[in-house]
């Protein structure tokens, strides 16, 4: 039997559908390879501060320690406690981790960078979700890096009738990042207004219906504001079930999202995407999937460029979907190769 302890974002953000999608997808893929299999969830923040001896002893009772995915290479999770990392005796696997830095925020400190270096030196296997993060690690002297894509790309879907869609209309999913980010105080309300105006145009121009794809509880504030502006929209909120949200993403004809995992779930569902970026990770992932020209910096976003990029993306839907299918097949091959490497660790 293979026993895995998996540290990722859980306690604070487990109501964030993207974080749930990451955790469940990694768990499910490991379960399919490591049979029989036991799984112990851990909170990533437990690795940041000194812990009693029993904490590390519990980790070392397992066969493998998985850390990730998500944007763990960021100021929010670093530095990790060096003594804990050095005391982990079982193989460490870094799974699909990404670099995260809000637009307008500071670079990582040297202490945080050294923590990343230590973590990767101690790891038996390192994987990242995009090419930028791979380049970042290689610049730190970490050479053996597997680029596998975000784990949540491969999340299964579960049918749901939570949102009843009109088959006669073009279905556009939208998402606004309403948790705190560096430029949030200045740009949140302007971007809600610009989104609303762009959606009004798309409703009339494309005969579209708008579906708000809620990733975080705070986003219901966005829905409330948009409805006060008389924007007709349906709301999908499947938390804490990410499988159902993935199903709804697959029903969309276009997604205009801000949250990182709005982009990930759309790509995983084969749905064309426009991204309004508030973080470097948005650019990095969209470039990784060949869609960098579909990114709008939140500082420059207005109804006109949201409309322009949305129409351009929608008009090219056939080619985008074809390219997404091909890239997803390639990434699944990489994912399987990485899972095979993990399975060999459990038998050594």
What are these regions (language model features)?
Residues 1-348:
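Active-site anion-handling motifs in enzyme catalytic cores
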